[in-house]
Amino acid sequence: MMTYIIEVATPAMSFWELEKVRANSLDEAKSFLVERYGKDAFFGYSKAVY
């Protein structure tokens, strides 16, 4: 399991937010954030941290 730092935003937000998510893969981390922010969420920079 790794920690991913991902920029996330939605059309309703006026700025990007950084989220820290522990997951087995980047796809799993993004799908967790889609559940949290909704399907209109989009992602910017992401980085894996051990």
Where are these regions (language model features)?
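Short, mixed-charge low-complexity intrinsically disordered segments
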Residues: E35-Y50
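Generic detection of short hydrophobic beta-strand segments and adjacent strand-loop junctions
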Residues: E19-V21
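Short aromatic-glycine-(Arg/Gly/Cys) micro-motifs in beta-strand/loop hairpins
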Residues: M1-E17
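N-terminal regions of proteins, emphasizing targeting and processing segments when present
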Residues: T10-A12, S25, G38
